[in-house]
UniProtKB/Swiss-Prot annotation:
Main location: cytoplasm
Cofactors: Mg(2+)
The species this protein was found in: Brevibacillus brevis (strain 47 / JCM 6285 / NBRC 100599)
InterPro entries: NDK-like_dom, NDK-like_dom_sf, Nucleoside_diP_kinase, Nucleoside_diP_kinase_AS
Name of this protein: Nucleoside diphosphate kinase
Family: Belongs to the NDK family.
Subunit composition and interactions: Homotetramer.
Amino acid sequence: MEKTFLMVKPDGVQRNLIGEIVSRFEKKGYQLVGAKLMTVSRELAEEHYAEHKERPFFGELVDFITSGPVFAMVWQGNNVITTARAMMGKTNPVDAASGTIRGDFATSVGMNIIHGSDSPESAEREIGLWFSAEEVLSFEKTIQRWI
């Protein structure tokens, strides 16, 4: 079963959007198999955003993600990575369609509510960074055969 990493960023946590976001993924039929509310260390933030290390906005990314609590999650289901990206909407909320998380709630590129893995490789790497194996549950919902 495909898994992805999603994170409600500090702006989403501060604006009380955790429940709204979780609800959207549950209603889509995806299964939450790991979740935690946490503060992010600078070390974890730098490792998470390592691919952007040479970009001018790297410091701002790290500062923002460490500025307040985040809600880190692991979701599973068929095509969860691609579907989650579509549900999130484009990175820039100006370009994000209404009905997407960013289109409905984000205020700027820098404060765009949510992060999601963009590929199976990213999902595996990010889940491993943010969660121990024991923190990701493995169970089958009885409704799964109808989704």
